[in-house]
From Swiss-Prot:
Its cofactor is Zn(2+). This is Alanine--tRNA ligase. InterPro entries: aa-tRNA-synth_II/BPL/LPL, Ala-tRNA-lgiase_IIc, Ala-tRNA-ligase_IIc_anticod-bd, Ala-tRNA-synth_IIc_core, Ala-tRNA-synth_IIc_N, Ala-tRNA_lgiase_arc, Ala-tRNA_ligase, Thr/Ala-tRNA-synth_IIc_edit. GO terms for cellular component: cytoplasm.
Length: 900
């Protein structure tokens, strides 16, 4: 959609002598006070000429630019609010905070809840990876991490705050009066914005080639068929670039110098790259507006312009600018890494962790291309020291940040050992596509740039997309939200049936200890029953649905409830059989299986206790990745970058039992969503993000508070005690804890005791002597194993000395029959094929192990063997084959002869 001219023809512009002009280059309309201006002052229509503009403001650091902006709007009636983390954990569909408006999506922008203040001002650290491949090349125009300073106003039908006129006036006053930019240099470029299903006209504020701000007027909803319908809630959504404000006031040759100051020189030194010539940098930066990173020709033209301007050889210009761009990339990426990890990201192969790992590996790749020996964590440490006052969380979580980065580097170095074999596999393809490279990166974590050199050795060429990392990030930056209907275990016809039913009154929230109740039947469908009220808890938040009985008061017939589910606010009781005696309008009595429910309550509450204990022991980066509460045990999946030590598990367990012994009150609370977020932070969403204006919190006194819709005990003492019975790494970056509490702990102790008694009987000792007896048995086994190894070595030596090869065309073929296990065979085969032109085959019935010397390939032999039927394969010089039928030595030798 293109807005009409009237959308932008503001009284403010007319009264203040702004003229509407059409840019001579891009043909876009813009507003300016300079009647002679022909261009919109945005790149690539002009060069960066802000260096030549006389700006009255003193040079501002990022910190000073941020404060100047926030104070300006505070003085003009805006409430300053704290920024949110760079991980958008209040959103189920988005992993990273990409703009300040994300702070208020979806619940404020949809009108579900009011904003924390109106109007408000915030400076929100944001991360966008769509431009990650362009960082450094454009001298700071593109960054992965930046601060979006913003003032927002939310205009309701019955409450107008301000709109276009005031927003444009604020921008003009800030840039001309507060920063001292000459009025004739300020331009407002007409544009259109769309995002997150909303749209509206916007104005881009440009000065001297730099876009300093975007003023969005969110006033339309984009419908499913692509039409635009007016919104009742009209939102002023502005975004001012804090780093660009610092850059335009400092007039440094790159934005990186304005953002990082002396850290720029420190990074060049630590990385081991000579600092770029200052004159070359200034000229290159001035012409950088001409660069369109998506068009490699513009990069080439830019460098030719620099070469011509300075009279320097083009190759020297390219080499120096390439090196500097790589250092700028590392500056940018290490700050992004620091912020991600400080806010709790754990690098992994999925979700937000995937995006964190992508940035880390790209930084490591760049260091490798620069042939630098510096450890990445050393550079991140410099960033922490530099930003610790601006972002206190980076200092608080310093140990975790550095530990996680070093561990990622060690993993990356191990992965790079695979490069030769991956390159060999790719080299066999007739064409290497972008999809192939993404597949290799996703499966093995190998950047294509590092495959390039290995593939060149094999005379294989491929085209590396300039935006490779952006392509990969785009595939992983969002998550699909499941609807309430997708999450529930009910058939489609049942879901359709309940759409007309009223919400169920949740008695389990009024009294979590209520065991029975009376209710009225609102719906009966097959074996599904819906009542006006219930104390049966429906499955949710990892807690299983209640079971029990529904009793027909007319006939006294009892129906077993085998599960309870919920769709939106309607609770469905699933019965073992169809309730033939129950009709809509009948009164029934419900009784829950209290013993089962009470076990679930204990396991649910102790899950909260253990999660907080894990954070205390392991660090604030720990986040709930999943949970399940059953009557038999509880299960909690947490994000963490390492396997837990025995000592860490013991500490978590000790803290949890201490909280139980302290008899702490457990209390549910209901709060306004925004109020809860501002008071407790987004960690309240550990167990999921509820979609309501008021949210239910569970507070364990002086220990933990988070959003939770489950049922809980009212005091930690009711849990009794807890024992962690299993800890395992279930996927990269996720650790699973399993535990038992209360009666389930007693059951576990009994079962364990029974196993000890049984084991003692098997080995003929008493339970108290079990450990010492097992040690003796293990020592005896070890002695026998050592003896077996000695015998095997004797047999192996004898075999190698006496085995005679078959000769085929100057090739030696060894055949071994019925020898030892597979690993032992493999070792003998390796020794036999240590010299060129040698093949060794071990035969055990119809199973074959085949090895060749390094100058031969095993695949041709395998191919010939499998012609007679069978399965198997291998790569390089080793293979395993299972034939459909057993073959004699002579038959195998004949097959080998054919393959040669």
């Amino acid at each position: 959609m293109k807005a009409s001219e009237e959308e932008y023809r503001l009284n403010f512009f007319i009264k203040n002598d702004f003229k509407r002009k059409i840019c001579k280059s891009c043909k876009t309309p813009f507003w300016t006070r300079d009647e002679k201006k022909e261009y919109c002052s945005d790149i690539p229509c002009t060069d960066y000429y802000f260096f030549d503009i006389n700006i009255k403001s003193q040079p501002l650091t990022v910190k000073e630019a941020r404060e100047k902006f926030l104070s300006f709007f505070e003085k003009r009636g805006h409430t300053r609010i704290s920024p949110k983390p760079v991980l958008a954990r209040w959103r189920e569909d988005l992993y990273l905070t990409i703009a300040s408006i994300v702070d208020f999506q979806p619940h404020v922008t949809s009108g579900l809840v009011p904003p924390p203040a109106n109007p408000l001002v915030v400076s929100q650290p944001s991360i966008r990876l769509e431009d990650i491949d362009n960082v450094g090349i454009t001298f700071g125009r593109h960054l992965t991490t930046f601060e979006m300073a913003a003032h927002h106003a939310f205009n309701y039908p019955d409450h107008y705050v301000y709109w276009k006129e005031e927003t444009t006036a604020y921008a003009t006053e800030f840039f001309t009066k507060e920063l001292g930019i000459p009025e004739e240099e300020l331009n407002f470029k007409e544009s259109w914005w769309e995002g997150g299903g909303n749209a509206g006209p916007c104005l881009e504020v440009t000065v001297g080639g730099l876009e300093l701000a975007t003023l969005v007027f969110m006033q339309y909803k984009i419908t499913d068929n692509g039409n635009y319908t007016p919104l009742k809630l009209k939102i002023v959504d502005t975004g001012y670039g804090v780093e660009r404000i610092a850059w335009i006031t400092q007039k440094t040759p790159s934005a990186f110098h304005a953002i990082y100051g002396n850290l720029v020189y420190k990074f060049f030194n630590k990385i081991g790259v000579a600092y770029i010539d200052e004159t070359l940098l200034k000229v290159a930066s001035r012409f950088a507006g001409k660069i369109d990173p998506d068009n490699p020709d513009t990069i080439k033209i830019h460098r030719q312009m620099v070469s011509k301007e300075l009279g320097i050889d083009i190759k020297a210009v390219e080499e120096e600018l390439d090196r500097a761009a790589k250092v700028f990339q590392i500056l940018d990426h290490t700050k992004t890494i620091m912020l991600m990890l400080a806010d709790g990201l754990v690098p992994s192969n999925s979700g937000e962790g995937y995006l964190g790992r992508l940035v880390i590996r790209r930084a490591l790749k760049v260091l490798r291309l620069l042939k630098s020996d510096v450890r990445l964590y050393e550079l991140v440490k410099e960033q922490i020291d530099f930003w610790k006052e601006d972002f206190p969380q980076v200092l608080k979580n310093k140990d975790y940040i550095l530990d996680a980065v070093e561990l990622e580097q060690q993993r990356f170095e191990k992965i790079l050992e695979k490069v030769p074999s991956i390159a060999s596999t790719l080299a066999r393809k007739s064409e290497i596509t972008t999809e192939d490279l993404i597949q290799v990166y996703d499966s093995n974590g190998i950047p294509p740039d590092l495959l390039e050199e290995e593939l060149k050795k094999k005379s294989v060429k491929f085209e590396l997309p300039r935006n490779f990392y952006a392509l990969v990030a785009k595939r992983h930056q969002t998550s699909t939200i499941k609807s309430a209907y997708d999450k529930v275990k009910l058939p489609k016809d049942m879901l359709e049936y309940i759409t007309a039913l009223q919400p169920t009154e949740k008695l389990y929230y009024k009294d979590q200890y209520m065991r029975s109740f009376e209710g009225k039947v609102l719906g009966v469908y097959k074996n599904y029953l819906i009542l006006d009220k219930t104390t049966f808890y429906p499955e949710g938040g990892g807690q299983l649905g209640d079971t029990g009985l529904i009793i027909d008061e007319k006939s006294s017939k009892r129906y077993e409830v085998i599960d309870t589910q919920k769709v939106n606010d309607v609770i469905v009781h699933i019965l073992k059989e169809e309730p033939s005696t129950i009709k809509v309008g009948d009164n029934v009595r419900g009784e829950i299986n209290w013993e089962r429910r009470y076990r679930l309550m204990r396991h649910h509450t102790v899950t909260h206790v253990i999660l907080a204990a894990a954070k205390k022991v392991l660090g604030e980066h720990v986040w709930q990745a999943g949970a399940e509460k059953t009557p038999e045990k509880g299960r909690l999946d947490i994000t963490h970058h390492k396997t837990l030590t025995e000592e860490e598990v013991k500490l978590i367990e000790n803290y949890a039992n201490s909280v139980i012994s302290d008899r702490r009150q457990v209390k549910p609370l209901e709060m306004n969503r925004m109020e809860a977020e501002m008071k407790y932070g987004v960690s309240i969403y550990e167990g999921g993000v509820p979609n309501s204006a008021t949210i239910r919190l569970l507070e364990i006194k002086d220990w933990d508070i988070e959003s939770c819709g489950g049922t809980h005990v009212s005091n930690t003492s009711e849990i009794g005690a807890v024992k962690i019975i299993n800890v395992e790494r279930i996927q990269d970056g996720v650790i699973r804890l399993e535990y038992v509490a209360g009666p389930a702990l007693v059951d576990y102790i009994r079962e364990t005791q029974a196993k000890i008694v049984e084991a003692s009987k098997i080995i003929g000792t008493s339970p108290d002597q079990l450990t010492s007896r097992l040690r003796r048995i293990l020592n005896e086994i070890e002695e026998k194993n050592n003896l077996i190894i000695q015998y095997r070595r004797i047999i192996e030596t004898e075999l190698l000395n006496n085995l005679k090869p078959y000769e085929i065309n100057s090739n030696k073929i060894y055949i071994i029959e019925g020898l030892g296990d597979e690993e032992e065979n493999k070792e003998i085969l390796r020794k036999l094929t240590s010299t060129d032109n040698t093949i060794a085959i071990s035969i055990s019935d119809n199973r074959l192990q085949i090895a060749t010397s390094k100058n031969m390939r095993v695949d041709k032999i395998v191919e010939e063997l499998l012609k007679g039927g069978g399965k198997g394969g291998g790569k390089g010089t080793f293979a395993n084959v299972i034939l459909n039928s057993k073959k004699s030595k002579e038959e195998i030798i004949e097959i080998v002869r054919k393959s040669l």
